[in-house]
Amino acid sequence: MWRCRASPGAQSAPLLGFIAVRDRYDQAQCLQAGRIWQRAHLLATARGLAARPSNEAVEMVDHERALARPPSRAALLDRLTGDPSCQPTFVFYMGYPKHAAPASPRRPVEAVLLR
């Protein structure tokens, strides 16, 4: 199962979440799911939480579809929502980090403002 291959840090995360859409192959819905993830990730970081994507399960849905196999992974994922019209399209882990991540380099705000 895909969860067994997750990194040790992810396995200890107390939250496994997902973002679901009505049609995981609709471009507008996928873009909106990405925006939701960006906002949730920024909010989590601001509150001292760590979050990381874990889309192996969703990628397996695409893999089965590309190979014209029965949608067994899609059926498993769809059961997570309890609503057959909601399809998980983005999976993530979230929790409090054991170690602080190094800060990513940032330019000063003045360097990126348009005037």
What are these regions (language model features)?
Residues 1-115:
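Acidic, surface-exposed loops and disordered segments
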